[in-house]
């Protein structure tokens, strides 16, 4: 399933209007992903069919733009440390693999491993888009942490 399809599915899902905190967190990483979301590429694919769905999507979906992998790690660490912060049922991470593909080396691998561990330790359901190639290092790290944590 693609990012747009999954977000559309979450927007169309049954929202309880008495819920006070956001239900979905979308984390957008890197300039390319940010431009896609901000310049309307995403809006063309994700639409709401009802007024209630539109209101719910505005109130229940939070979007965070981050420029570096280390900022994602800091943000995830803060999310876990906040006991009374917003609780999300779903976290969609968009652009992580593209952002990490620009740099190689042990530092980047270590940081990616830390980020994946933090993501998969969240009580929320975390999904990564687009999915990494199955034989790539990020995909193997993702399978490793998924096996260890879940």
Curated annotation (Swiss-Prot):
It is found in: Nucleus. GO terms for cellular component: nucleolus; Shu complex; site of double-strand break. It comes from the Eukaryota. Keywords: DNA damage, DNA recombination, DNA repair, Nucleus. GO terms for biological process: DNA recombinase assembly; error-free postreplication DNA repair; maintenance of rDNA; positive regulation of single-strand break repair via homologous recombination; recombinational repair. Component of the SHU complex composed of at least CSM2, PSY3, SHU1 and SHU2. Plays a role in a RAD51/RAD54-dependent homologous recombination repair (HRR) pathway to repair MMS-induced lesions during S-phase. This is Suppressor of HU sensitivity involved in recombination protein 1. It comes from Saccharomyces cerevisiae (strain ATCC 204508 / S288c) (Baker's yeast). The gene is SHU1.
């Amino acid at each position: 399933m693609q990012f747009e399809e999954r977000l559309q599915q979450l927007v169309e899902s049954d929202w309880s209007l008495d819920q006070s905190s956001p239900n979905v967190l979308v984390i957008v990483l890197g300039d390319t992903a940010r431009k896609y979301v901000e310049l309307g590429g995403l809006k063309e694919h994700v639409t709401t069919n009802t007024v209630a769905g539109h209101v719910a999507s505005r109130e229940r979906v939070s979007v965070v733009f981050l420029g570096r992998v280390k900022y994602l790690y800091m943000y995830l660490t803060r999310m876990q440390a906040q006991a009374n912060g917003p609780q999300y049922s779903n976290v969609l991470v968009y652009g992580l693999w593209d952002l990490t593909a620009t740099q190689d080396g042990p530092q980047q691998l270590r940081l990616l491993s830390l980020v994946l561990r933090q993501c998969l330790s969240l009580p929320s359901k975390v999904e990564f888009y687009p999915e990494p190639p199955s034989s790539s290092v990020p995909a193997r790290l993702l399978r490793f942490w998924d096996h260890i944590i879940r």
